[in-house]
């Protein structure tokens, strides 16, 4: 009797697995027919015509934490300095963004090279919120002046500045409040954004 019950359970399990496999195969076939992979006919595409629309802006983009250097007051810096459950650094060899490429200090040279060496006409960069507002409600006028000078340098170079106000890093004070999860915290980002538009 017990053997019969085990055999019945095995048969039911096999039927369920076969049914799931069949359902998966049908779903894959249906999806591939409904949303086929695009196949380019390169023989019909004139690759010698590489023109872009008039006014197209060739540019470069950076993120403050990754290039500025010295960003130690945000959640990414905290994560870079943390360890996993086994005590290993979260980043290989314990490396961190650290001084990065020192864009904070070297931006005039970087902008000149973007224009002269690469022929770029625009530059998108991010404003590091943790530098501008290192503590809740306390704005750093030196950091704001720095970003104004950077924008002026981009314009003086004949390039168009494009600004990102949030590139995935939060000031530690904001992160410790729960970041963007609590709805009431959004007001802090709105206040920062308004200050940047002044």
Which positions does each model-derived feature cover?
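Substrate-binding cleft and catalytic face of glycoside hydrolase catalytic domains
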Residues: 69-71, 111-198
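Hydrophobic alpha-helical membrane-insertion segments, chiefly the h-region
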Residues: 20-29
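Small/flexible residues
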Residues: 4-7, 36, 80, 126
């Amino acid at each position: 009797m017990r053997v019969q019950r085990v055999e019945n359970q095995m048969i039911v399990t096999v039927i369920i697995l076969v049914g799931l496999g069949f359902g998966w195969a049908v779903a894959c076939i249906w999806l591939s027919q409904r949303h086929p992979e695009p196949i380019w006919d390169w023989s019909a595409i004139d690759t010698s015509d590489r023109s872009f629309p008039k006014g197209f802006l060739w540019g470069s983009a950076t993120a403050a934490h990754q290039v500025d250097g010295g960003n130690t007051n945000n959640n990414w810096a905290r994560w870079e300095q943390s360890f996993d459950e086994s005590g290993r650094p979260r980043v290989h060899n314990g490396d961190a963004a650290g001084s990065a490429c020192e864009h904070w200090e070297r931006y005039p040279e970087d902008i000149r090279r973007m224009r002269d060496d690469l022929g770029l006409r625009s530059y998108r960069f991010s404003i590091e919120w943790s530098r501008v507002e290192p503590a809740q409600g306390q704005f750093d006028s030196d950091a704001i002046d720095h970003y104004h000078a950077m924008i002026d340098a981009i314009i003086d170079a004949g390039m168009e500045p494009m600004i990102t106000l949030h590139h995935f890093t939060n000031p530690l004070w904001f992160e410790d409040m729960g970041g963007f999860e609590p709805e009431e915290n959004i007001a802090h980002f709105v206040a920062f954004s308004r200050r940047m538009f002044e």
